[in-house]
Amino acid sequence: MTENHYLLLTPGPLTTTKTVKEVMLYDWCTWDVEYNTMVQKVRAKLVSLATKEEEKYTTVLMQGSGTFSVEAVIGSVIPKNGKLLVCTNGAYGKRIVQMAEMLHIDVVVSQTEEWEPTNIVEVEKILQQDKEITHIAVVHCETTTGIINPIVDVCKLGKQYGKVTLVDAMSSFGGIEIDIAELQIDFLISSANKCIQGVPGFGFVIAQRDELLKCKGQARSLSLDLYDQWETMENQNGKWRFTSPTHVVHAFYQALLELEKEGGVRARYNRYYNNQKLLVNRMGEIGFKPLVNEKYQSPIITSFIYPEGNFEFQQLYNELKRYGFVIYPGKISKVDTFRIGNIGDVHEEDINRLVDSIAKGVVIG
């Protein structure tokens, strides 16, 4: 077991480094110039991670979980006469649909099975038939299963038909290389406690400046007004409109520095990729099969199908927790699965220890 109480093999919150945790021992004032300067550095670093064309984009930090930032985008970006196309194959795509419905935004859905990627042919057919669609949203890595959706093709189609593109990159940004300018993404949403390896407390939106400027006065919420949040940060040197999670921001800044030290997004992707491949190979040796086809599988989290015979997930969970590991239950309805994450401060020796614990026979009868 590591210095942590448990090794979190989850898609976030995840296992953080000792140094990320240590910076949260200090208190910060939200009005302090040093703190607000740190906020500005965070915003700039996020844009530089996202694209080489930095002048075209800006970052908005938003208190709360990643879902708060997604809802801030949905509620602020789409005008009253707008219409949203959502590509969904899991819980997080469905959540965007639910947000749109709650906010009385006209919404149409392109839905595929949870283990199948977004169907580009169907998406284009919908765009051809429905001229009222103004925006298109897709989840990059759907952690319901661990599947990767074809955001390159979705965004290319979106721009081909003149739509504003929204990408939920909650569980991929910082762990998979993305150039939002090349992909023509107008709004990308992610969170502090995912591949950057910070802790929960805020999400962020990397926005195309010209599109963000169009959002002024459109928000359907005071606290989730994306434009107002950005304008305050922009004009008041990193100040948030309402109380910000100071400890979380400091931890995130430290996590960004550690990402750079590791070698950037490509190096982190390689570690996650190697973790995932090792996990699947080792689990296969003891009878566990992944749900998602290898060509659609992300390096973020892997869903495994329940093996035949006397298998109980809760027994597996309890025994692994006793050995110092925490994994995730399944989240789909048609197939019994459980999930194991590959991200965070997790390395190949951790994956080997995990599978060794499962293989001992104490969890599978």
UniProtKB/Swiss-Prot annotation:
Q: What class of enzyme is it?
A: transferase
Q: Which residues carry this modification: N6-(pyridoxal phosphate)lysine?
A: 194
- The source's superkingdom equals Bacteria
Q: Does rRNA-binding show up as a keyword for this record? A: no
Q: Which InterPro entries match?
A: Aminotrans_V_dom, NH2EtPonate_pyrv_transaminase, PyrdxlP-dep_Trfase, PyrdxlP-dep_Trfase_major, PyrdxlP-dep_Trfase_small, SP_NH2Trfase/AEP_transaminase
**A single GO molecular function, which one?**
2-aminoethylphosphonate-pyruvate transaminase activity
Show the SUPFAM superfamilies listed in the entry.
PLP-dependent transferases
Question: Which EC number(s) are documented for this chain?
Answer: 2.6.1.37
Under catalytic activity, the entry for this protein gives:
(2-aminoethyl)phosphonate + pyruvate = phosphonoacetaldehyde + L-alanine
> HAMAP family under this entry?
PhnW_aminotrans_5 (MF_01376)
Q: How does it assemble?
A: Homodimer.
- In Swiss-Prot or TrEMBL terms, this protein is called 2-aminoethylphosphonate--pyruvate transaminase
Q: What is the lineage of its organism?
A: Bacteria, Bacillati, Bacillota, Bacilli, Bacillales
Its gene name is: phnW
